[in-house]
Amino acid sequence: MKFTKMQGCGNDYIYVNCFTETVADPSAAAIRLSDRHFGVGGDGLVLICPSNVADFCMEMYNADGSRSEMCGNAIRCVGKYVYDRGLTDKTELTIETRAGIKTLWLNVADGAVETVRVCMGSPEFRPEKIPVAAAGETFLEQPIDVLGETWIVSSVNTGNPHCVTYVDDAMALDFPRIGPAFENHKMFPARANIEFVEVVDDHTLRVRVWERGSGETLACGTGSTAALAVTARLGKCGDEADVILRGGTLHIAWDRTQDLLYMTGPAAFVFDGTVTL
């Protein structure tokens, strides 16, 4: 099977063109291929497929084989793949995901996509839609117990369920210990992606990410979007900010007039290969 390794701000996935390739068991393939010692290495597997309702369909599997609704970094890479590899000549695309149809605008220079802007949709703050095991209109600035310590957290769905909390120094955290405890907390029936956020100033956030099903990643597009949405709603930053991640920087903007979030960032090829499953 032919595949392509791509990354967006260091959030790397294995991409398969399912117009020409077939993956019989994507979940098992994701587990095997994502292994950084015995496989290709990546945060998961992305299948680029035909769609009856959009230009293309993106199917995502986390490194543990579980399905994912949406990934902001991966969808930018899909946009670059289909344009640079000649599957389309459009610079405005629609991509079907489990979180709905997303619109992409491709920034092309010298025949290749450099950056991609994505409409991430509206932030969903209702607990039952995130989902969070709590009543009320929102789940913002609420205390939860994690490994015997009280954390103040806020939740939102920006394509995936997210939990946002604020820290002074994200890099000082014991991620292998607290990451799984947050992800699998009883408040999150579908598990959650966790963003540990430092507010640098009104237009700059620094974020460290623990992703559901993949562990710590260098970047998360839906997570960066969630961090901006929660932080702006709480009045801790403006409606537009650069989100600095371990693997790079994403620009997130919230158009309150239409209640739509936009993410802009890079996408890059790493290498092509062939593997026997």
What are these regions (language model features)?
Residues 86, 129-131, 143, 235-236:
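Glycine-centered secondary-structure boundary/capping sites
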Residues 1-112, 163-277:
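A glycine-rich beta-to-alpha transition motif near the start of alpha/beta enzyme domains, typified by
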Residues 1-22, 118, 130, 135-136, ...:
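N-terminal, positively charged, Ser/Thr/Ala/Gly-biased leader segments
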